[in-house]
Amino acid sequence: MYRAGALVLRSATLRRTRFLAAHQNFATISSQRSSVLLAKSLESSIGGAGNQKKFYSSKDHDDPIAVDDSLELYKDLGGMSPIQVPADMPNVPILAINRYPLFPGFIKKVDIVKDDNLKALIRRQLSLKQPYAGVFVKKDDENKEETIVSLSEVYPTGSFVQIIEVRDQGSVLELVLSAHRRIRVIEPIEDVVAPKTDTPLNGRRARGKRAGLPPTPPPTPPLSTPTSAPEASATSPEEKEEKKDPERKGIVMVRTENVVADPVPKNNETKATMMAIVQTIRDVVQFNQLFGQQINLLLHPSQNVIDNPVYLCDLVATLVQSAETKDLQEMMDETDVSKRLKIALLLIQKEKAVAKLKHDINKDVEKKVQDHHRKYLLNEQLKVIKKELGIEKDEKTTIIEKIDERMKTLAVPEYALKVINEEKTKLQFLDPHSSEFSVTRNYLEWLTSVPWGLTSPENRRLSHAKKALDEGHYGMKDVKERIMEFIAVNLLRKSVGGKILCFHGPPGVGKTSIAKSIANALNREYFRFSVGGMTDVAEIKGHRRTYVGAMPGKMIQCMKKVKTENPLVLIDEVDKIGGAGFHGDPASALLELLDPEQNANFNDHFLDVPVDLSRVLFICTANEISKIPGPLRDRMEMIDVSGYLAEEKVAIAHQHLIPQLRKETSLSADQLNIEDSALEELIKHYCRESGVRNLQQHIERIFRKAALQIAEQQPEDEQPAATTAISENSDAEPVSTPSDPPTFTPEKINISTENLQKFVGRPKFTSDRMYEVTPPGVIMGLAWTAMGGSALYIETVLKRPVDVTSDKDGSIETTGNLGDVMKESVRTALTVSKGILAREQPDNKFFDKSHIHIHVPEGATPKDGPSAGVTLVSSLLSLALNRPVVQDMAMTGEISLTGKVLPVGGIREKIIAARRVGAKRVFLPAENRRDFDDLPEFMKSELDIRFVSHYDELYEHLFQ
């Protein structure tokens, strides 16, 4: 492909230098030495300041031509001696170029890289003393091929050029072309190698040379005519193959004809157009002073350039940089010189507009740069003056004074003070513009942002704390008692201490919000951060200072924000912390933070100085404590935050949820009323979860729909609108003030069980229990989940009728997404059931030959744990005896292999579930009596609780 390098005449400034230097010489010398002076115009590009050779013409030895020594002139060109350009040479090689045409009288550098056939043709032409070619512009600028396959790919009018310089590097052939005249392509012809003939020394050309006659033009290559047999036989096999597939072979040789311009009319219009062109060129030069002198010399009347309209048009086409290819080609194609002058005038005027715009832009940019530079110099001078007068200090002194001012209010320990002083000394010797200066300054700011020795006064009044806790949350007896105990201990110690508590329970019961109330009750600063999904240890312990953008961990950020050493820090979702990975184990990093024996000297990676966190009250929240790592769980004081009963939810709705929503929606009790029966229906059939978050969302939906109804009842002309108050000052902005309230009184909306479905949709839970009457083999158990308690039915049936005559033993199958522990409970329950049945009814061989299937409904929910042991035994015995158990009964408890009933957890949640499904009698392990006694009285009412220590006691209640 052709590579238009730095010598390409279209390239900005270098290209203009060659053109103008060439045409300045053209105006003053004879036409016989035109080729030599054209080569001289390339002196700035191919001459250089290095080693040069000097070539002389045969007539004038005082006119040296400087040529770069690195350029290897083709040997057969005869050392740059002048060659008479033939007036008519129809068959020439074709060179297809991109973007800009090459106009007569100008020079262009072209590289041939890919096409070997074209390179071979050019070398052959040079060896035949025919350094000529035709240059045509490709219509598609994106076409990077060096040859064309069709003449339709190029514009028909081009230039006849002479190859004045050659540098053959083997793979690349560099050509310097000088255009002489316009030509038009007619048709492609085949490239046929002419046979070489030896020219005798006494031939006509040699005699003419000795006689001093001008050399005759070399013979033209043969045309594409049918060759004779000897010539055809001389064709190589490779050329025959190329002729077989002409579509793949590019066109390298064409037949052309000279383009003769029409006579130039000598009238005033032509002269005026030329003068306008010359004046516009002078205007363009004003915006680019680099070539102003050369252009002015070239356009001087003594040079006769302005008297040659053809040359003037070509000069314009070479000078313009913003013109499109089709516009330049239009000038190349035009034979009417008058029209060509008009095209040239239009192009140079467009170039003038673009040049003026570029000049204005550059001028504006230069002005802005100068203004900025001037302001910078003035500011620097002002800084120096202020520094000399003592008005302003340098950056280092300002930073150090700021740090010293901070430290006056801090009780910095000795080890931290030593580090601060070392960093201050280091800062004084650093360059303010260095990266180390920024790192040191940032480190000092963080060191002095830690509230060393600062504590906030803590509330020690129990009455104030109790009032603050009761106002924010209903119930939560265990949490409130523990906080009161904490205040009492600090009161007796007369000091501020820390503790690590963990609130665990189902979602929506107020674990996170109670922490804010505790902070208000204790008068401590509050800071919260969540560790759910955290996988990077640096979030807790900070980054090393060697990293770009390093920062301390969450605890140091907390200390900087709260500005006290005794805040309340809530670590939310501690059971969902990420596991060990590429960035460490965050759960293990919390061990040092939450260990009372270690957090007095907590070491952050960024500060690298021990910080005392022993006065911080840490409160963690979790849904499932089983997911908290054991060592971390061991460092916390676990407090169970159980779910709410229906009565508690109603009280929370009246005391907290509804008043808050009235304030947010501006709906008073006169506009919207929710009956207690509607709340109970809402809790029973829509919001059965342990928390109140879903209940809050449903009540919000009721308030929104009520607000919409009230807004629709209000007439549009009575809707409140904002009035605009304009002050006497006309320049003041208008201020919007609310107008008088409307006189419209909306109809009161009352929410009851009858219209509740209209506001919140259909009930989610339509029945309290799966079975109203349980058949044999079906027992209702009680289960604990992270969402609270729930009823868990155990269904046991026969897979097929019992065949007492079969030799095969019975089998048991379990379904319902059971875990390994629960599957073991099934096998244990089967063994216990066989023992009880053999003792109570020795003749009953039900379990020996039966194929039993045990299923636990809601198979999509994973189920595991040992607390369903007594329920499984009861279900198996009910099926074996074919006797249903007592209705409205529920049970829970782990069974041992000998029939002993072991204690289980989640008694509060299970009692709540039993009350929700309407159970009247509940069987609990005897060892869980203490857990039941801790429940409030209203929760224990209306339930018949039976405590059993062995399954025999339960058997008597169920089947006897």
Swiss-Prot record:
Transit peptide: 1-56
Record-linked SUPFAM superfamilies: P-loop containing nucleoside triphosphate hydrolases, PUA domain-like, Ribosomal protein S5 domain 2-like
A GO cellular component entry from the record: mitochondrial matrix
Residue ranges, annotated region (Disordered): 195-250, 712-748
Top-level EC class as recorded in UniProt: hydrolase
Active site: 867, 910
Listed SMART domains: AAA (SM00382), LON (SM00464)
Residue ranges of every copy of the Lon proteolytic domain listed in the record: 773-960
Record EC number: 3.4.21.53
Feature: compositional bias, Pro residues: 214-224
Keywords: ATP-binding, DNA-binding, Hydrolase, Mitochondrion, Nucleotide-binding, Protease, Serine protease, Transit peptide
Subcellular location: Mitochondrion matrix
Record field: compositional bias (Basic and acidic residues): 237-250
Entries under InterPro entries matching the protein: AAA+_ATPase, ATPase_AAA_core, Lon_bac/euk-typ, Lon_lid, Lon_proteolytic, Lon_Prtase, Lon_prtase_N, Lon_prtase_N_sf
Predominant location: mitochondrion
Residues where ATP binds: 505-512
Every Lon N-terminal domain range: 92-352
PANTHER family membership: LON PROTEASE (PTHR43718), LON PROTEASE HOMOLOG, MITOCHONDRIAL (PTHR43718:SF2)
Subunit-structure text: Homohexamer or homoheptamer. Organized in a ring with a central cavity.
HAMAP family reported in the protein's UniProt record: lonm_euk (MF_03120)
Family membership noted in the UniProt record: Belongs to the peptidase S16 family.
Role description: ATP-dependent serine protease that mediates the selective degradation of misfolded, unassembled or oxidatively damaged polypeptides as well as certain short-lived regulatory proteins in the mitochondrial matrix. May also have a chaperone function in the assembly of inner membrane protein complexes. Participates in the regulation of mitochondrial gene expression and in the maintenance of the integrity of the mitochondrial genome. Binds to mitochondrial DNA in a site-specific manner.
Name of the molecule in the record: Lon protease homolog, mitochondrial
Originating organism: Caenorhabditis briggsae
Gene name as annotated: lonp-1
